[in-house]
Amino acid sequence: GLGDVYKRQVYGLTELNQDKIKSARLIAVPGCYPTASLLGVLPLLNKGVQIESILIDAKSGISGAGRKAVENGLSVEINENFKAYGIQGHRHLPEITEIVELVSGYPISINFLPHLIPAMRGIYSTIYVQLKDLENLDFQNLYDSYYTDSPNVRIMNSEEVPDIKSIANTNNCNISVNKSNIENQVIVISSIDNLVKGAAGQAVECYNLMYGFNQSTGLDNG
C-alpha cells in the first residue's frame, strides 16, 4: 500500500542523507523552498543548540509557479512588482517542519512565508533562528565544518551576502550566517536556483549516488 511506499522512501537531500541515498531505491526529492530553507538551518539542528523558533522569509522567481502560470501572464503581472502568497499556509511548510523536527529531535515553532519577485529563477531565503542561548558558538566555523564535504554548498564570509544572480543556472547553494542585533538570534541567508539545486539538479545528484557515480557528475558548472 501507499503507507509501505512512504516508509521505503528516502528524503533526497544529499547534504543530509548521502549514505541512505546510496542504498535507496525510492527517493523523495525535496521541494525548492525546503531545499534552500533546510540547507540554511541544518548545521544548527544537531549541535546541542536549543532552537526556540524559526522564521523563514522566502522569495522565488516566477518559474517556481510553473510553466502554465508564466505563459498565462504571471511574468507581466509580477513585472516591477513584488508580493507575498500562501499566507494561510503553503504546501512546503509541512515538509520543512517534518525534516527540521526529525533532525533536531524536538518540536520547533516554524513560520514560513513565500513571496514572488520579478525574476525568472532563483530562491532567496532569509531565515531568522531564535536560540535559547548562543553559547558563544562560532557559527562561521560550525557551517564551514558541516558542509566541508558538500561540493555544492558554499559558506560565505561575514562580509559577503548571497544573491540569486551568482547561483542562476548552477547546482550551487550560497549561504551566509551572522548574529542578529536581537539577543540570541542568528540570521541565515540561503540562495539556490529553484530549477537546478531546487529540482532537476538535486534529482541528478540522487541518481548519481544511487548508481555509484560522483555526486556532481553532469552538474559541474563550466
Language-model features, listed with the residues they occupy:
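Secondary-structure boundary/capping motif
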Residues: A36-S37, E135, G198-A199
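C-terminal helical cap and adjacent loop that interface with cofactors, partners, or active-site loops
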Residues: I21, I164-G222
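Predominant activation on well-ordered alpha-helical scaffold segments within soluble catalytic domains
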Residues: L38-L45, L93-T97, Q140, D144, ...
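Residue-level signal for short, function-critical loop segments
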Residues: C32, L131, N194
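Short, small-residue-biased leader/transition segments that mark boundaries at the very start
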Residues: L2-Y6
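C-terminal substrate-binding/catalytic lobe of Rossmann-fold NAD(P)-dependent oxidoreductases
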Residues: E52-S53, I62-V188
